UniProtKB/Swiss-Prot annotation:
This enzyme's EC code(s): 6.3.2.-
Entry similarity comment: Belongs to the NRP synthetase family.
Region (Adenylation), start-end ranges: 594-999
UniProt name for this protein: Nonribosomal peptide synthetase acrB
Region Condensation, residue ranges: 129-564
Disruption phenotype: Abolishes the production of acurin A.
Entries under NCBIfam families matching the protein: AA-adenyl-dom
Keyword Ligase: yes
Function, as annotated: Nonribosomal peptide synthetase; part of the cluster that mediates the biosynthesis of acurin A, a highly reduced polyketide coupled to a serine via a peptide bond. The activities of the highly reducing polyketide synthase acrA and the nonribosomal peptide synthetase acrB are collectively responsible for the synthesis of the acurin A core structure with a heptaketide backbone produced by acrA covalently fused to a L-serine by acrB. After the formation of the PK-NRP hybrid product, it is detached from acrB by reductive release to set up the formation of the lactam ring by aldol condensation.
Inducing or repressing factors: Expression is positively regulated by the acurin A cluster-specific transcription regulator acrR.
Length: 1552
């Protein structure tokens, strides 16, 4: 189109960038003087600049790009390439901008005497670039597509056009407007690189004139201009092609770079071009753009912007987070961009609607169309977000031409303004919202002079490489455009236009034409929104515009914002398949009874211990129970208080035969809570079995406790239940502080079971029952089996908590059907995979109760079970288990990890609607409240009519068939979600303001917990707020409490302990931490702000029951360390802490079991951990029992004997000739000694290469081990595990190493004083055997790093460097024992080699206590000693505290040796002249002087220059822990001192 004028406030198009960073001490320095504005020839030099200059706001150069350019210059290359770095996009805003492409063309232009190429050509004037130009220039350099900011237009010209005269007019335009002949370059004036604009003396517009024979050529030329790369350093920023088809048919193709012109400038350009061409008039020079940029810089320097900056700081003081993507986005999160791929959709708004928009704006708001469009967009964005945010920030573009003179200037003036909006108030009309928006924007426009990038720096806006700062959606409003223009006697008509692309998510462009029409376009990033998404936004915007012109006074919330077509389509997607058969008229117990008659001998239910009931037996016992229940009077409710067992199933089926209502209770819940349930449902009876008789009697009250029958009745009992009767009542957490009972009918249950069977094509399933009985999944599993002719397998309580045992049970029973939460499945598949792989019948894994974990997908696929299908189910208890389901793994599943895991389409006979706040349907892709209709909707809440009425509402969208069947109610879930285009549901979470959450599948009302805390505190807690921290298995409840003013601080621990003990809540509902706060945060409506609550800081109150807790012992510190690895948050732990009270749960207990095994090598049964949740009790499980304690009874002969493969290697071994250059195998390279040893090896001239084996941490790289590039070239890492039989090396690698290596240094080991020998055998002894065999086969030296601790086995005062084979260790000293065994193994091999006459250098190195530096010596080593090293810690904290522990009775002799000395000694031995002596050589790396504790203290005092305080050991350790000493180290140190008082230690001797 042709742009002619802009009559409003000139809101124009814009360019926005994202952020990153880069810096370096090398910068471009551009020569030239600001005192000589003319005839300047800037020249490029490379120099060093103070690193501090990088933090200057004017610095526009990226260091890494400069390094590349420097390298290119040295190599004689004139151009550089910017490295792909997604982070560097922030450089502009820092302004640390990258410099690649722009300078390279100039470097090849003109040779010079000094070899430094000059830029061309000379300039008339030079001035700093504007802020907007800097923004464009940086992006031009940074983005990979240099055509991003090209603007291209094509016109058809009818009439006798004179191409040469038109070309002359273009050149005249360049004379009039300096911006059309401006070059852009960097100059380091004032020592900092800055972007300058140089005004060239002549036009640089590239004009071509062609005669063409086809309109196809027009398209080709247009594409060429569109894709042209403009040369900014040479001022070549515009390209024109004049094409003649016939004397009266012409085409004009015009292109330019956005840095030279903005949209308003294009209007000025066209107007001036018309005048010059039509009249031949020579127009005088227009006002200069460079004067504007100079004024802009001066305004910033003179603080002219201060008032406006203060305004923006005030208005944007509480910025909202970046706007979420709309739900219909193609991706779940934004990504950093280095190119913009933008597409768009457009629609013309006819004169009729356009006139109404103008009239409405004027009459209703006294304003213009622009403000009405902006208000409509504002409301649309809130609706599309589903009101997920109450605050948003939108951008508008401003022409930046407040000065009248600027209306004549061609240049880059456009600016962008951020506008923060709040959601409309309840009941607020559009009229009022329009007035509010107009006032807000008009005020903002008075402060529009501040450049966008100055505003960002001043506000210190947090940058991200993935989204635009401040706003992600912009409204670009244009006025006065026309499709046609006059060129002399010719008419020019717009054919097409390609605008510059932006990095914004979305740009809404509104163009107002002089003929009264409007054109509305929505432009967006292709990777974010598809064309359908853009079209939906556009359609919705037009709909709201139509609405407000008809009903401007209507409340905003009542405005219809989506078109009827999209709503109708959404309703169609919301409804599942409708199927109604004769079975829907039956109850599930009828379906069960039918199979009992047909196949009475089939197994119906069985326990893990082998007990089972056939269908006939189960029917008989159930009917006997039904008979007994029929004899009783009272309500139909029957409470079942049984452990999961055969009795439980007999109870459920018997209750249903009797036509009664099943009410399950979890016997592990507090008795007070169970009593509340009994009082609410007033049961006819409470069923129990032997294990629960006392509980049942205690709960009974007026009810009758009935034992479950152990035998069946002789005659049949007729089924009393019908589809309209209540099948069960499940109690869930309630907001009033009491649990609420959900009433589910037999019709609801039948609907669910049949829908599941149809959707998942279920047959005769073997179903695992492992859910809690009070969970709806429990009922689902029972009748998935019994109503489908299958078998139910009951997992006992102890197996339910152990994923390995559970998986084993599944494999034994050949389970086909499971129902669990994501967290439960994660543990099952991670820890029980080997057993699950044997469960070849496994067909259906249903996942529900919490968000599906995408990490489960590869885990399930790795099981390689071809028949297995994994399903994601969604649905609350109130709709009978589930309403939607999606196959995730299987033939028709997603089968890949993805950010978006849908819940699937509605099940048969269910409807899943997404409704807005007015309970109206929204289109697919728009979030709203999930509301469920159909045959599974429950009957309401027991004894709670008000809550029932608010949550179970009339379904006005129900089909006629649904209404006829009585399915005319809708359950409002309070969950947020949206529908995909295929009708699949995506669950987003809870609606704003909801206090309901899910904790590992269990529904929790936070209000209930808060009420219980206040009620239980005996008045000491005035108010409480509870929130969830973490996700899935890591989710914990955190409580924040406001205390009565007179509550003493020192009583907080006892208060919290009291609350933890007495809260009448199930364990999963008890907070794991309590924090005292002065007040709780509330939102503007006065409600508790849970989002703000979760961000409150504060130290959790320790839960103590002892005012003077004893320090933790060694085992307790080990356990505390394990707890901290698995517990979320920062729990305060003591010996009396309970794992479940500080954030633990049964799923984390599984993780804890593995961590304990990793730390100690001891496997503790889950049942033991579960039954002893206290810290002290759990720690006692780590103490070795006498019956299992490892002693010298270990068969050391067998342990250290030579294996057949090792003997074979010895038989064929021969000495390999030494080489001047050696390749070395090294283990333990990442450890304290290993790192130093590695550095010395790499630096040694004889070492050709170092092969580091068994690098366990996959994140370790060559760069992390050495910063020297020459050393890195000599280094190869092999990630693996010492415990692996071949150190994780494959045969090919072993063979390759065998042919290359000349030396083996085995320094690696698993260092743990907690683990027994049997645990350390594999990593410490088997690894020695493998490497020893490799050395013998190759015939090369073998050096083994043992420990000086083995000499203590001798019991002698001193011990020389000789064998200790005659002093076998106790097996419980695992680390020492493993080193002794390796020494003995090496000795046996050396003796066997000697018998064959083969001499291989075999050396055992025994280092004493290795330290970074010895006491009394200056300096430090580059390596840091292990954090858990006892002696190092003792010395380190003695230095820090200038305090020493009292050591009476401790006969320690401190033998410290520096790490550098040990490494040098090993290297000297390995690379020095070989010892000709036979057998194993022993080397002691120790200090000649052994220090007593007194001597050590004196050394440290002399080193520090002061006297150290001496305190008893317990006090010293307490202080050290406060200074940071690890608790386990502290406890071990105390334990060592206590156990070793009076013990005589063996000193290491240096000579034999």
């Amino acid at each position: 189109m042709i742009m002619t004028a802009n009559n409003d406030m000139a809101v124009r198009e814009s360019v926005v960038v994202t952020e990153g960073a880069s810096s370096t001490p090398e910068l471009w320095q551009m020569l030239g003087s600001r005192d000589q504005p003319t005839n300047i020839t800037p020249r490029v030099r490379i120099t060093d600049v103070d690193h501090k200059q990088l933090h200057s706001s004017a610095n526009l150069v990226s260091a890494r790009a400069l390094q590349q350019l420097t390298k290119s210059l040295h190599e004689g290359i004139c151009s550089t390439a910017l490295e792909d770095d997604s982070q560097s996009s922030s450089a502009y805003y820092s302004t640390y901008a990258s410099t690649p492409r722009s300078l390279s063309p100039n470097l090849e232009a003109v040779p010079s005497d000094d070899g430094i190429p000059d830029l061309q050509p000379q300039f008339e004037a030079v001035e700093r670039a504007s802020f907007a130009q800097e923004r464009i220039w940086f992006l031009h350099e940074y983005l990979t597509d240099p055509t991003t900011f090209n603007v291209t237009m094509a016109y058809a010209v009818q009439g006798p056009l004179q191409p040469a005269e038109l070309a002359t007019a273009f050149r005249a335009m360049s004379d009039r407007h300096e911006s059309l002949r401006t070059a852009f370059f960097l100059d380091s004036r004032d020592g900092e690189p800055q972007l300058f604009q140089g005004i060239l003396p002549e036009t640089q517009i590239e004009i071509s004139i062609h005669t063409i024979d086809s309109t196809q050529v027009v398209d080709e030329v247009y594409a060429s201009v569109r894709d042209h790369v403009y040369d900014l350093p040479r001022g070549k920023t515009m390209k024109v092609a004049i094409l003649t088809l016939t004397p009266t048919t012409h085409f004009l193709v015009l292109g330019f770079h956005h840095i030279a012109l903005d949209g308003f400038s294009a209007q000025i350009f066209i107007k001036d071009l018309q005048l010059i061409y039509s009249t031949g008039q020579i127009l005088p020079p227009a006002p200069r753009y460079r004067d504007y940029t100079l004024l802009q810089r001066q305004s910033l320097a003179n603080d002219t912007y201060r008032e406006s900056l203060d305004f923006w700081k005030s208005k944007l003081a509480n910025l909202p987070p970046p706007m979420p993507l709309f739900a219909f986005s193609r991706v779940a999160a934004r990504k950093p961009l280095n190119s913009y791929r933008v597409h768009s959709v457009e629609r013309t708004i006819g004169i009729s609607l356009a006139s109404k928009i103008k009239d409405t704006a004027h009459k209703v708001g006294g304003t213009t169309s622009f403000f009405l469009y902006l208000t409509a967009l504002r409301e649309l964005v809130f609706r599309l977000l589903g009101h997920a945010q109450r605050d948003i920030c939108l951008g508008i573009s401003d022409a930046g031409r407040a000065d009248k003179e600027a209306l004549q200037v061609v240049g880059m003036f456009v600016n962008m303004l951020p506008l923060q909006f709040r959601a409309a108030r309840p009941g607020q009309s559009f009229r009022d919202l329009l007035a509010t928006t107009t006032r807000q924007v008009r005020t903002a426009l008075t402060h529009a002079a501040v450049p966008y990038q100055v505003l960002l720096d001043e506000l210190a806006v947090q940058r991200s490489p993935s989204e635009n700062p401040l706003f992600q959606i912009l409204l670009n409003y244009k006025m006065g455009s026309t499709e046609e223009a006059t060129l002399g006697h010719c008419r020019a008509h717009s054919l097409r236009m390609d605008d510059a692309r932006t990095g914004l998510d979305l740009v809404i462009e509104v163009e107002e034409f002089v003929d009264g029409n409007f054109q509305v376009a929505v432009r967006g990033q292709e990777y974010l929104y598809g064309e359908e998404g853009l079209e939906f936004i556009l359609s919705s915007l037009v709909t709201i515009l139509e609405e407000v012109t008809l009903r401007p006074s209507m409340p905003v919330a009542n405005l219809a914002i989506f078109d009827e077509k999209s709503i109708t389509h959404a309703l169609e997607l919301s409804r599942g398949e409708h199927v109604f058969t004769a079975e829907h008229l039956l109850t599930v117990v009828h379906l069960f009874d039918r199979h009992c008659k047909a196949h009475p001998r089939d197994v119906a239910v069985k326990q893990a211990d082998g007990q089972f009931l056939s269908y006939g037996e189960l029917q008989g016992r159930a009917q006997e129970l039904a008979r007994r229940l029929q004899e009783l009077e009272g309500s139909t409710a029957v409470v079942v208080a049984c452990k999961p067992s055969l009795d439980t199933i007999v109870s459920i089926v018997g209750i249903h035969y009797a036509g009664c209502t099943y009410v399950p209770v979890d016997i592990e819940h507090p008795e007070e809570r169970l009593r509340t349930i009994v009082e609410d449902c007033k049961p006819r009876a409470i069923l129990y079995h032997a294990d629960t008789q006392d509980l049942a009697v205690a709960l009974a009250g007026g009810a009758i406790a009935v034992p479950t029958p152990q035998s069946g009745m002789d005659k049949a009992f007729p089924i009393k239940a019908s589809v309209n009767d209540t099948a069960y009542i499940l109690y869930t957490s309630g907001s009033t502080g009491k649990p609420k009972g959900v009433i589910v009918s037999h019709g609801n249950l039948t609907c669910q079971i049949l829908s599941m069977r149809r959707t998942a094509t279920l047959g005769k399933e073997t179903v695992l029952h492992q859910s809690g009985v009070a969970f709806d999944a429990s009922i689902d599993c029972v009748y998935a089996a019994l109503a489908g002719q299958g078998t139910l397998v009951m997992a006992p309580p102890e197996v339910r908590r152990d994923p390995v045992q559970l998986a084993s049970l599944m494999a034994r029973e050949q389970i086909t059907y499971t129902q669990m939460t994501s967290s439960e499945y994660h543990n099952l598949v991670v820890y029980g995979a080997e057993h699950l792989k044997q469960c070849v019948t496994y067909r259906n894994a249903f996942c529900g109760g919490e968000k599906f974990l995408s990490s489960l997908i590869p885990l399930f696929r790795a099981l390689e079970l071809p028949a297995l299908r994994v399903w994601n189910r969604y649905g609350p208890t109130e709709i009978t288990v589930s309403s939607s389901m999606q196959m995730i793994v299987g033939a028709d599943g997603l089968n890949r990890s993805t950010e978006l895991i849908p819940c699937g389409r509605p099940l048969t006979n269910y409807s899943v609607f997404i409704l807005d706040e007015q309970r109206r349907p929204v289109p697919a892709g728009v979030p709203g409240e999930i509301c469920i209709g159909g045959g599974g909707v429950a009957q309401g809440y027991l004894n709670n009519a008000r809550l029932t009425a608010s949550k179970f509402v009339k379904n006005i969208y129900a089909s006629e068939d649904d209404v006829r069947r009585g399915w005319d109610r809708l359950y409002r879930t309070g969950d947020r979600g949206y529908l995909l285009s295929d009708g699949s549901l995506v669950f987003l979470g809870r609606m704003e303001g909801s206090a309901q959450v899910k904790i590992r599948g269990q529904r929790v009302e936070l209000d209930e917990i808060e009420t219980a805390i206040v009620a239980t505190s005996e008045g000491r807690v005035l108010s409480a707020g509870v929130c969830v921290k973490g996700d899935n298995a890591d989710a914990v409840l955190a409580a924040y409490v406001v205390l009565r003013p007179d509550v003493q601080v020192d009583s907080l621990s006892s208060l919290v302990a009291s609350l933890a003990r007495s809260l009448p809540l199930p364990r999963y509902m008890r907070p794991s931490s309590f924090v005292a706060v002065g007040r709780l945060p509330h939102n503007t409506s006065g409600k508790l702000d849970r989002q703000a609550l979760s961000k409150l800081s504060g130290t959790p109150i320790a839960i103590e029951t002892n005012n003077h807790p004893a320090p933790l012992g060694v085992e307790e510190e080990v356990m505390a360390k394990a707890w901290r690895e698995v517990l979320p948050g920062e729990a305060v732990l003591s010996a009396e802490s309970n794992f479940f009270d500080v954030g633990g749960n049964s799923l984390l207990l599984v993780r804890l079991q593995k961590v304990i095994e990793e730390l100690t090598g001891k496997s503790v049964a889950l049942t033991e951990l579960f039954s002893t949740p206290g810290m002290s009790a759990m720690a006692r499980l780590l103490q070795p029992q006498e019956a299992t304690r490892e002693t010298t009874e270990v068969d050391w002969e067998s342990e250290t004997q030579l294996t057949p493969s090792l003997l074979s290697a010895i038989q064929t071994s021969s000495r390999c000739s030494p080489s001047s250059e050696v390749e070395v195998i090294l283990t333990g390279a990442t450890g304290f000694l290993g790192r130093t040893l590695l550095q010395q090896l790499l630096a040694h001239p004889r070492i050709a290469h170092v092969h580091c084996l068994a690098i366990r941490n996959s994140s370790v790289t060559r760069a992390s081990l050495t910063s020297n590039p020459d050393h890195a070239a000599k280094l190869t890492l092999y990630h693996g595990d010492l415990s692996h039989p071949t150190l994780s090396l494959n045969e090919e690698t072993i063979s390759s190493l065998s042919n290359r290596i000349g030396l083996v240094i085995h320094n690696g080991a698993s260092v743990s004083f907690l683990k027994s020998y049997s645990t350390l055998r594999a990593p410490n002894v088997h690894s020695s055997r493998f490497l020893l065999q490799l050395s013998i086969e190759r015939g090369i030296p073998f050096h083994f790093v043992s420990t000086g601790g083995v000499v203590n086995l001798t019991g002698q005062p001193t011990w020389p460097p000789v064998s200790v084979r005659n002093y076998p260790p106790p097996g419980e000293q695992g680390y020492i024992a493993s080193k002794w065994a390796s020494e003995r193994l090496i000795e046996n091999a050396a003796e066997a080699l000697h018998l064959r006459g083969v001499h291989l250098p075999v050396v055992v190195h025994r280092p004493a206590s290795i330290v970074a530096r010895q006491p009394g010596t200056p300096g430090t080593s580059q390596s840091e000693p292990p954090a858990m090293d006892i002696m190092h810690n003792m010395v380190q904290y003695a230095r820090i505290m200038q305090c020493f522990p009292a050591t009476e009775g401790v006969n320690w002799r401190f033998d410290f040796v520096g790490v550098d000395a040990v490494a040098s000694g090993i290297l000297a031995s390995a690379l020095g002249e070989e010892d000709e002596s036979e057998g194993v050589k022993y080397v002691h790396h120790c200090n000649e002087r052994k220090l007593s504790p007194r001597e050590l203290k004196k050394e440290l005092e002399e080193e520090a220059g002061c006297v150290f305080e001496e305190v008893e050991v317990g006090e010293w350790v307490r202080r050290a822990k406060e200074c940071g000493m690890d608790g386990l180290v502290a406890a071990t140190l105390v334990d060592l001192m206590e156990r070793q008082r009076g013990v005589v230690f063996t000193e290491m001797g240096l000579d034999c």
